[in-house]
Amino acid sequence: MPSVVQSNFRVRKNLGRVRRIIDVPNLIDIQKSSYDKFLQMSVPPNEREEVGLQAVFRSVFPIKDFNGTSELVFVSYNLEPPKYDVDECRQRGMTYSAPIKVTNQLMIYDTRDGGERIVRDIKEQEVYFGELPLMTETGTFIINGTERVVVSQLHRSPGVFFDHDKGKTHSSGKLLYSARVIPYRGSWLDFEFDPKDIIYVRIDRRRKMHATVLLRALGYSTQDLLNYFYSTETVYLEKGGKYAKSIEYDLLAGQRTTRDIKIGNDVIVKKNTKFTRAAIRKMKEAKLERLSLEPEELVGKVAAHDIVDPETGEVVVEVNEELTEAKLERLRDANIEQFRILFIDGLNVGSYLRDTLLTDKVKTMEDSILEIYRRLRPGDPPTLETAKTLFHNLFFNAERYDLSKVGRLKLNYKFYRDVPEDERPGLDLTVLTPQDILETVRHLIELKNGRGSVDDIDHLGNRRVRAVGELMENQYRIGLVRMERAIKERMSMSQEIDTLMPHDLINAKPVSAVVKEYFGSSQLSQFMDQTNPLSEVTHKRRLSALGPGGLTRERAGFEVRDVHATHYGRICPIETPEGPNIGLIASLSTFARVNEFGFVETPYRKVENGRVTEDVIWLSALEEEGKYIAQATVNLDEGGRFKESLVSARYNGEFKIVTPEMVELMDVAPNQMVSVAAALVPFLEHDDANRALMGANMQRQAVPLVQSHAPLVGTGMEERLARDSGVCVIARRPGVVESVDATRIVVRAEGEGAEVPDIYHLMKFQRSNQSTCYTQKPVVRTGEVVKKGDVLADGPSTDMGELALGQNVLVAFMPWQGYNFEDSILVSERIAKDDVFTSIHIEEFECVARDTKLGKEEITRDIPNVGEEALKDLDDSGIVRIGAEVRPGDILVGKITPKGETQLSPEEKLLRAIFGEKAGDVRDSSLKVPPGVGGIVINARVFSRKGTEKDDRARDIEDQERARIERTRDEEIKILRDSFFRRIRELLLGKEATGKLVDDKGKVLFQKGAIIDEPSLAEIPRKYWGEIPVDDAERVQQILRDLEELVRTREEHFRDKIDRLSKGDELPPGVIKMVKVYIAIKRKLQVGDKMAGRHGNKGVISRILPEEDMPYLQDGRPVDLVLNPLGVPSRMNVGQILEIHLGWGAFELGNQLQRMIEQQRASAEIKEHLKAIYAGDETMNGFFDNLDDGDVKRFVKTVDEGVFMGSPVFDGAHESDIKGALDLAGLPTSGQAILFDGRTGDAFDQNVTVGIMYMLKLHHLVDDKIHARSIGPYSLVTQQPLGGKAQFGGQRLGEMEVWAMEAYGAAYALQEFLTVKSDDVMGRTRMYEAIVKGDYTLEAGLPESFNVLIKELQSLCLNVELVETSAGVEASAAEEEE
């Protein structure tokens, strides 16, 4: 029976109090789902949605020629299987991509006399459209052999935005409001107020014009516009020549009355007072309909329409004209009984649009369209037809203007929220409508009138994510549009369109070129950070505000970078780079996902009538507005009701204290607001934000170590991250482990399709992008039962399927001889000796033999002027052997390059004369190990151009690879056969033979009626099993047919692989042969290496002390690391102290359990102790009761390093938990102990904080940084040595160093620094010659940089000449002048 205690699963005590409601969504889903949606690879062509590639093809096709006689129509596309698999692409430096084939129809039309078109001919053909990179299982792309990630972009969402200039434009500080309609692609439309309150419009940020020009161009008259933007009041002429106006109750609030308003004798509103709500209510009750007016009240009002004399038909007052006393007199004379005026009171309603109409000189629709044309195409003589076309194309043509669904959604949200659903514009309407433009102006005027508020562009409802799929879609569209132009020209130019096929018209080069360029060099397509699994996952979850169409570092202000209230649960407030990109590059939060519109959503639990339900809904930042949201850590009772009478809740970004009934939603988890990297930091809630940021970022730089150990104090997120990162091997189906070795695991599957076993090949010592070592090792044993999703093998930096970036080490916080000054770290020699922090790094070196002008370079062992000692590790082909230990300067690949005839020096001539013509025409250009690198050669690969003969080494490598592939093939087929025959055996056993079975030689193997049992079946050769006559013979036959089919496809697959091996490689032009050599470098921990904890506590190793000199505990155990206690208070990362206490307790509890096993205590006693340790963790209740004695021992063995704790972020262990763990382990609850000095044996004065801390070794290794220059390159202009290790540069002597030399009065040393050691070219040569002669005097000349300065001055037209005179002559000349 299989054990309850799994070898591939770690039990972690959960110290959190909040129950898990939903699982964290797949961490790299943002990449995978986006690209899947783009390709729709698994969807049949006729069922594809109009998104991604399908949408691009649909939007560009059909392509019509200029005459309308033919068109090219898109039918469907399909992606073929990729030529090389992922591993082959990595090794060969290829792109992992699939050929895309598009089915097109070329339709040719005939035009009849009446203008009617009829189809004359349709030609359909599948056309090759280039290659499209595919995404790997882990969400990356392989481009030219390297893994790259396309980072998602966070950009401003299309839609309409309202803003003001914050009073900066005008000196008075007046707020000038503006509106901007941003489409996904197309022209931008801006409306803005000027300081005189006139509304202007700009199209594509050109010169501004009156907004009414655009509105008139839409076909609206002055009257239409006034009636749209203003309410009207009707004025009546009453008997006696008095005026009255109709009461519009909606407009009364806030107005003043000019006379007492009475109902009967009661005065409701006194003269010169405002209408109150109560007064309006009384007026409504009394059903007052008119208010009498004084004539002077009408003076200055504006007519809402042309007021016409009914008798003469003459217009007395034009629309938008002010009423004057004279006009009123004329109206009275003409006896016009009623007319409408605009309601403009200057308080609630301003006269902005009316004023704009007055100042606008353009009055008709046609003139307006021509005016717009003139502004956009200055210099072009406009005709009405071209102007109309241009205007229509600007905003109303779907080919030129696209709001996208998101833009339409945002417009509907802004303008039509109160309109019934069926009356709103549909999401498929992605062009502007005249109504949208009117609404934009109306909203702008409302803002100016003091109603509503401007938009916050940093609100996540106004920013959206463009993931890989969408970015690729845009690139593909650019390529297709380029191709479309060429196709149109070809279709129109070609006379024989009848004889052409679609492939004659289509040249897909521009499309593939765009795609290739995007993946190779776009700002968002990045070289994957592959230091460890966490850095990979974080890179894929990154959101960047930079990139094409985004912000730039220099222009981005503080607001864009800042944390916004809507980031909660969507974007991590902690994880962002330090430096110029701070805030511009962010990370998705743990539970966040991106919806179909590109807005980031976060999950919430629904709360109904003060009771929290299990329903989870995902909301975007816009949908969350106006909701009261409780925290995940609020106390609930059994029924899900709030225990407290008042609850803290978020409301529109503010925290409020509300009653439980008001709460509508609740967070799903405490770690909902932080990203994955921040969620891995235990006790994050006790760390200062700046240090938490460093802690989250530095985990990404941790190097995978030779021995991985998961943290004793984790957060429970480790297992999820390791699983989703793709570095572990995960079981695809349930089954039983059949065989395990270091390179592959075979699982006999159960359930559907169980005949085919699952074979998992493990990755072995692969070089990552950052030269760290990626390797996998099995964690399951033969015979073990595995479930779907179980971990079968650990990858780099994982331990039992959990992320393990560092090591648990015993740390003491105390000063030690000044060796922990400025965050330095004192380390015990045991750490170096036991390889605790040892890592393996794999460097790749490349040697290329080219065809040069002087002849071909050759890779060979025969190198001129090199002794046999230097060639001892090279084989006959001149390539280093695998397993050789190499040091700096050793030859890895011998190569000779032909050189031109050069003038020989006398020495060379002499040597030639003595030794004859020894390799005079070639020089040694071998690949040597660079300085600072040394290790063991673990692999060498030879790539030869197709058609060239391979050398011995290449043939050896090919033979080995072929043998490996054949071995794998044979093993796979054997496993397949065994599995199928096992199935047949199960079918046959116990059955009765219905006939006799005879072999080829006539021997009877089975008699009729015999019962088939195990021994008799074992004696029959397998090839006869299918012929055994039984009732189920047909099923057996079917199984055998399936087996043969499977075997055939597998053999074909491997045959293809072998064929590709022998073909030769595709190399860049001019390259004959390329050799790659891989060297594994073992890096032990040493002085100068950088280490860090998870709380931003970083430091450099200052000294490695012998174990016996380290401070030790009372039981004699020396500590591993000594850290500076002064690094904690000022940095406020107290989380590390809590971690160290809990870690110590966890470690000692593990030791206690081991001692109990050693003392052979009863398993019941051990179980009780385990229950006490895991008390409070609901998941572990009842687990220990089911364990037998063997299981107990096995379980205790899994905690030999300590009891693993999980302290989730923001829901972590409390002080009582930590004290409880220390107490249970028999340790002082203060977390401090007496330490003894290892050198003297004396106790230190005070108790010291000691415990287990999880420390990481970071990628900043001293071996990669240490560097010394001997003879190196000089800068071309200044003639000074270059800087930096990569350039083999020198150490810069800056002005501060010069001051120091001056302060010491070391004049000659300083002169030497500034001249011969730097850029005095002549002086350098003289110095060399002098030293050779044994003369050690310094003769400095003129530094080259002085000449540069003179040249710069001359470039400024200042002539500077150096005049050489002797000092004496100069002095006397000066005296004479005096």
From Swiss-Prot:
Keywords linked to the UniProt accession: DNA-directed RNA polymerase, Nucleotidyltransferase, Transcription, Transferase
Pfam families: RNA_pol_Rpb2_1, RNA_pol_Rpb2_2, RNA_pol_Rpb2_3, RNA_pol_Rpb2_45, RNA_pol_Rpb2_6, RNA_pol_Rpb2_7
Gene Ontology BP, a term: DNA-templated transcription
EC numbers: 2.7.7.6
EC top class, as a word: transferase
Reaction(s) catalysed by this chain's protein: RNA(n) + a ribonucleoside 5'-triphosphate = RNA(n+1) + diphosphate
Keyword Transferase carried by entry: yes
Keyword check for Transcription: yes
Alphabetized PROSITE patterns for the sequence: RNA_POL_BETA
CDD domains cross-referenced by the UniProt entry: RNA_pol_B_RPB2 (cd00653)
GO CC annotations on file: DNA-directed RNA polymerase complex
A molecular function GO annotation: ribonucleoside binding
Protein purpose: DNA-dependent RNA polymerase catalyzes the transcription of DNA into RNA using the four ribonucleoside triphosphates as substrates.
Subunit structure and binding partners: The RNAP catalytic core consists of 2 alpha, 1 beta, 1 beta' and 1 omega subunit. When a sigma factor is associated with the core the holoenzyme is formed, which can initiate transcription.
UniProt similarity note: Belongs to the RNA polymerase beta chain family.
Name by which UniProt lists this protein: DNA-directed RNA polymerase subunit beta
Originating organism: Sorangium cellulosum (strain So ce56)
